[in-house]
Amino acid sequence: MNIQALLSEKVRQAMIAAGAPADCEPQVRQSAKVQFGDYQANGMMAVAKKLGMAPRQLAEQVLTHLDLNGIASKVEIAGPGFINIFLDPAFLAEHVQQALASDRLGVATPEKQTIVVDYSAPNVAKEMHVGHLRSTIIGDAAVRTLEFLGHKVIRANHVGDWGTQFGMLIAWLEKQQQENAGEMELADLEGFYRDAKKHYDEDEEFAERARNYVVKLQSGDEYFREMWRKLVDITMTQNQITYDRLNVTLTHDDVMGESLYNPMLPGIVADLKAKGLAVESEGATVVFLDEFKNKEGEPMGVIIQKKDGGYLYTTTDIACAKYRYETLHADRVLYYIDSRQHQHLMQAWAIVRKAGYVPESVPLEHHMFGMMLGKDGKPFKTRAGGTVKLADLLDEALERARRLVAEKNPDMPADELEKLANAVGIGAVKYADLSKNRTTDYIFDWDNMLAFEGNTAPYMQYAYTRVLSVFRKAEIDEEQLAAAPVIIREDREAQLAARLLQFEETLTVVAREGTPHVMCAYLYDLAGLFSGFYEHCPILSAENEEVRNSRLKLAQLTAKTLKLGLDTLGIETVERM
């Protein structure tokens, strides 16, 4: 149920009947304050200006054509021409019933699209670190939301699995006679990478052999391809452990590494030359883009092939966008890549559009994000100033959560305690990130993220268990409750019901903008409204059975909405804390 969309269409029709153009925007928004109703139409100002009349006068005319019978109990004009809409309690009650009768809580399925989501993208032969966390969990929340809405989502893990470093790694693997690389763990492989690099820098004979191996690998020699595959498999097997711990839906099947596009690069360069978009410049192949200027104010040159014949990330990203449209048949492509890559992506996509590889009707969207900072406001590092490994961060989260839940539940059995600590610890790390606007940097703070108050995972998980506990005490079966009507008489009942019915609107924003923090804010607000409702509208001690069961149904929809909302974020819920 999308009340905002329903009201927007009703107000738009009334505006057209009052003389507004057919493309007018009613600008219906959820009201910021209760006194302004549940929704507010703010579009009169802009339209009245075009019509040469006072906004309030237009609002009055719109009201004469606006039929919200059975939807709103009151509609009024406020200020210079805002239209405040107060939803009818009977309308709310009816739709709460409908939401409870549906597995999807009344959420409609939009027109199905094929959406490619590019996220996570770790590098081969390196362990995942905190720099991979944001892309991985924000991208996964977007994927979960889009899939819930019914879209076909293709996860694309753009792994860094190609490049000159593989010659060096294969040469070192050979030198160490570690043919059985499958048994190596990634922690060893990380040290292995460092040793290989040191050797490469210090031993010219070894470096020369490594360079020859790159050529052999790139020419498709089976022995070198097999060695390369071993390195990729070891890395991704270890990364899968991290994905599983993070409750992220990526699997080995979602790997679409840089190597996938490698065979396409010569054809891309040749085609861009044939189309007159790429030219030779100082031995390299370059595309000059008018949209981007260099320091001298001239069109910026984007290199797609170096003098030595090597290709660049831009070339790969051009091939990648083309592949996603032509082969994967994407209707929309989302990239969860940090904000520092913005200009690079914009340049690659400008070339993609000019070459006609992806039509303008298919959006390529950079859902960029800021950095994770320590309490000192600087990039998050270890005490020694090194990069924090993701596995170490999750270990610490688990350890801190273990202490926290053991303190609150001294008699809980060990296996139950471990399960709860895992849900709280991993949930806390993820929610702390997801609850912030992805476009900004955020401060990583253990105390804040593990707090049981405020917009945190432990608070949300506790809020969910609190609602469930009402049912345990009520001792009523679901069938009995299903037959009971919903009656809304109190203001707090109406406020909670209206917010519950805004779940679909929240999902729609997250799906459109790729902003999971909007879902976090919604769920936190919902938990707060339930708290106020619980305090002021007795449930178990209600004046009669009819009111008791009606309030239990509002509690039931609250629990289902919290659980489903947290699930779209990849946050685990628990039944007891």
Swiss-Prot record:
Keywords: Aminoacyl-tRNA synthetase, ATP-binding, Cytoplasm, Ligase, Nucleotide-binding, Protein biosynthesis
Principal location: cytoplasm
Gene3D superfamilies linked to this entry: Arginyl tRNA synthetase N-terminal domain, HUPs, Isoleucyl-tRNA Synthetase, Domain 1
GO biological process, one term: arginyl-tRNA aminoacylation
Coiled coil stretches, renumbered: none
A GO CC term assigned to this protein in UniProt: cytoplasm
Subcellular location field: Cytoplasm
Entry keyword annotation includes Ligase: yes
Pfam families recorded: Arg_tRNA_synt_N (PF03485), DALR_1 (PF05746), tRNA-synt_1d (PF00750)
Class in the EC hierarchy, top level: ligase
Sequence motif 'HIGH' region, location on chain: 122-132
EC annotation from Swiss-Prot or TrEMBL: 6.1.1.19
Record SUPFAM superfamilies: Anticodon-binding domain of a subclass of class I aminoacyl-tRNA synthetases (SSF47323), Arginyl-tRNA synthetase (ArgRS), N-terminal 'additional' domain (SSF55190), Nucleotidylyl transferase (SSF52374)
GO molecular function terms noted in the UniProt entry: arginine-tRNA ligase activity; ATP binding
Catalytic activities: tRNA(Arg) + L-arginine + ATP = L-arginyl-tRNA(Arg) + AMP + diphosphate
Oligomeric and partner information: Monomer.
Annotated family: Belongs to the class-I aminoacyl-tRNA synthetase family.
HAMAP family: Arg_tRNA_synth
Protein name per the record: Arginine--tRNA ligase
Species of the source: Escherichia coli O157:H7
Lineage, top ranks: Bacteria, Pseudomonadati, Pseudomonadota, Gammaproteobacteria, Enterobacterales
